[in-house]
């Protein structure tokens, strides 16, 4: 659509479009670049405020590489620099995305209906990069009067095969098609698609916000480096689980991660006993409970106090899956004096702890909750008898594993300075 003037803050885009006599008819779809929408809405800031503007528009950082930030903005869009852009704007300024692109699209649609009496769809477009693909394309960030998604699930293809996952991003396809004629530097910020009346919808149709995938469904929520860092802090102690079964394959993958931990003398001091049957879990927990009660009675605790303490073990009893990590000291050195022999054992204990931590972190990566409980360390002989383990295996607690009954709360970051001494 040639002939549009330079857009300034306060301009009515519908009137500007109508003024160039575009010959619009019912069923047309207007593809409007977000740049002119931002200009009309006064979303212009000084270029030296760019970083502050990105900060203000950012909800979370998805990935960072040097000065480049891929972020999620307040509309849920994941894009470079929160869409703050220095192109197609006067030198010394940058443009922010429209505050509410769907509302912007509705305003243009309503304005054209009032001015020209036509029923058209409007898609506000912006340029996005894409994971796994080189190059840019336009996508829909706002829409009105357009079926933004075409859900084909439940139908069949030409061969009669069921369609179970096909949801076509119609608004994005329209945006990309429009970019072929608008270009990035041709001074043509609006294009018209004609001949697709089936994509036109009523005023109550969802806008482009419906195309934003929610966090719980996002398999690629973080960049690679960010995901690796966050995986460590995702681990939580989970004490309540659902009845959903635990995938044994996920636990075995976590064990594979666990045994990459550092260990002394090129040894492998970890063993993980997987209690996958209810019978084995009950046998162990009953034996440990009896040993605990005997210890508490030896401490002259009251029966009421004993019952209260024993209930703390319910986190293990209520878990659908248990793992008993054990330390083995095969390959350890004997020095013949207490000081060095104690240090040798401590090395193996530290290595076992590193393996257990790897295991817990990997479980979190598998979306499994866990709780490490120390109890098996207080009755190792009992545990070995109940599980038929060799005398050389030293139980180092137990890990309850399952699907968390509720989403763990965010944990505030700790100030590392409180734990650091520099010399």
From Swiss-Prot:
Coenzyme F420-(gamma-Glu)n binds at residue 295. It catalyses: oxidized coenzyme F420-0 + GTP + L-glutamate = oxidized coenzyme F420-1 + GDP + phosphate + H(+); oxidized coenzyme F420-0 + FMN + H(+) = dehydro coenzyme F420-0 + FMNH2; oxidized coenzyme F420-1 + GTP + L-glutamate = oxidized coenzyme F420-2 + GDP + phosphate + H(+). Its EC number is 6.3.2.31, 6.3.2.34, 1.3.8.17. Pfam families: F420_ligase, Nitroreductase. FMN binds at residues 263, 374, 411. GO terms for biological process: F420-0 metabolic process. Disulfide bonds: none annotated. This is Bifunctional F420 biosynthesis protein FbiB. It comes from Streptomyces avermitilis (strain ATCC 31267 / DSM 46492 / JCM 5070 / NBRC 14893 / NCIMB 12804 / NRRL 8165 / MA-4680). The gene is fbiB.
